[in-house]
A protein has these predicted regions:
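Non-catalytic structural scaffold of enzyme domains
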Residues: 1-218
């Protein structure tokens, strides 16, 4: 599936690619990087790097999907930088559907979060990686449950900074802002209307439409 997405984006003549999904980064990044010449980055390594800079007691928590936790990639990257660090992973599979249902402030979501995070609170972590792109939308709730003593790390933010550096290093960074009434293009493989509604609820730009593509054609 990640390869099909890559093939489609190549038809759009992209100059760089961010695999902005922790699970896809964990499972497909290394393979995809070997297949194209454009710069490609994932979100796992940037998140791991900033967590290593942030922790004071070398106890780092990671919440993510089951696939990301099972891959062990966050722990691998963290141990490359801080071999002495203890990494505690916790899969939180219900967070994604709760966010997509628009239940971020629902009492049910707080109850689910409290049960997921109880184990991490008992481990005395001081840094917690939000290892899924949906989870920063629950940042306020997660922070409230974990307490001020735990620093939350959003890999997406760190990835954006790394992308800027990467574009500058390759001499392909643009110094102009996107022009036109609709300078952004959005493509989805399914559920275009749901994507538009969800995106308009969280993004600072208005998304009039998202184009649905047949990913199987790639």
């Amino acid at each position: 599936f990640s390869r099909q997405i890559l093939h489609f984006l190549q038809t759009r003549d992209v100059k760089a690619l961010v695999i902005a999904c922790n699970t896809a980064s964990a499972l497909a990044l290394e393979t995809i990087q070997k297949e194209v010449d454009i710069p490609i980055i994932g979100v796992v390594k940037p998140g791991a790097k900033v967590a290593c800079k942030t922790t004071r007691n070398n106890r780092i928590g990671v919440i993510a999907t089951k696939a990301t936790i099972s891959s062990g990639l966050y722990a691998d990257f963290i141990h490359q930088i801080r071999p002495e660090a203890e990494v505690i992973g916790k899969a939180c599979p219900l967070f994604v559907p709760l966010v997509e249902e628009g239940w971020r402030k629902d009492p049910v979501t707080r109850e689910v979060a409290a049960r997921y995070l109880e184990e991490l609170k008992d481990k005395d972590i001081d840094t917690l990686i939000l290892g899924c792109t949906h989870y920063p939308l629950l940042r306020s709730l997660i922070g409230d449950i974990m307490g001020d003593q735990v620093t939350l790390v959003n890999p997406a933010y760190e990835t954006a900074l790394q992308l800027k550096e990467l574009l500058q290093e390759h001499g392909i960074a643009s110094d102009t802002k996107p022009q036109g009434e609709n300078p952004y293009e959005f493509y989805v493989s399914d559920a275009a209307e749901s994507f538009r509604d969800f995106a308009n609820a969280i993004l600072p730009i208005d998304i009039d439409r998202a184009k649905k593509i047949n990913i199987e054609a790639y």
